[in-house]
Amino acid sequence: MNVEEMKKAVAKEALKFIEDEMVVGLGTGSTTAYFINYLGKLLMEGELEDVYGVPTSHQARLLALEAGIPVVSLDEVDAIDIAVDGADEVDPHMNLIKGRGAALTMEKIIEYRAGMFIVLVDESKLVEYLGQKMPVPIEVIPAAWRAIAEELEVFNATAELRMAVKKDGPVVTDNGNFILDAKFARIEDPLDLEIELNTIPGVVENGIFADIADIILVGTPEGVKRMER
């Protein structure tokens, strides 16, 4: 089973948690895209009914509409039953780094409010500690990015402004902000660092998701494995 097959396997496994009349938070990224497509197929075939999606990004919204999933905004629903999203790193305590898709702020808002948060990853995303492979994305007010990058030196972190690939200039989030990718030597206390980073003036949100995931579905060559609290 290659990586894409692992992604498809965990996406299909996540469908087992979806029931009629649910409001589902739809994450951003390649693995979640499979889930959105599969969910849309079940709705089109009548195997699920009255399921609504709350997208975490413009990308997720467009994918949901293409898949035939009715889309609503966060302020149109009283509650989110379940949220499904990917992650860039997962530590043994189910803490996450997210945000390579630059949608981390809405992801955290929606997933924090969900009754259940399910994370979809392949086994390459499992790490011994957060920061082992990936930097922590930090969404920042554009005018403050340089000052915040300097402030992060207090945390022994090196931060780089994320630049766009298919256009000139930096990546701009759906909220109109910039992304700093901050590399930490080792994140010993993810929850503490998550809170501390958000106290820096100009920081909108950061990509540490500590103590928030309920179930993590991990794609492996042997099949889907589950981590849960």
Swiss-Prot record:
CDD domains, from UniProt? RPI_A
Question: Catalytic residues?
Answer: E107
BP terms from Gene Ontology: D-ribose metabolic process; pentose-phosphate shunt, non-oxidative branch
> Per UniProt, which keywords does this protein have?
Isomerase
Which Pfam families did the record assign?
Rib_5-P_isom_A
Where, by residue number, does substrate bind?
T28, G29, S30, T31, D85, G86, A87, D88, K98, G99, R100, G101, K125
Reaction(s) the record says it catalyses? aldehydo-D-ribose 5-phosphate = D-ribulose 5-phosphate
Q: Which InterPro entries match?
A: NagB/RpiA_transferase-like, Ribose5P_isomerase_typA_subgr, Ribose5P_isomerase_type_A
Known pathway: Carbohydrate degradation; pentose phosphate pathway; D-ribose 5-phosphate from D-ribulose 5-phosphate (non-oxidative stage): step 1/1
Q: Name one GO cellular component term.
A: cytosol
Q: List the disulfide bonds.
A: none
Superkingdom of the organism of origin: Archaea
The family assignment reads: Belongs to the ribose 5-phosphate isomerase family.
Q: What does this protein do?
A: Catalyzes the reversible conversion of ribose-5-phosphate to ribulose 5-phosphate.
Q: What is this protein called?
A: Ribose-5-phosphate isomerase A
Species annotation: Thermococcus kodakarensis (strain ATCC BAA-918 / JCM 12380 / KOD1)
Q: Which gene encodes it?
A: rpiA
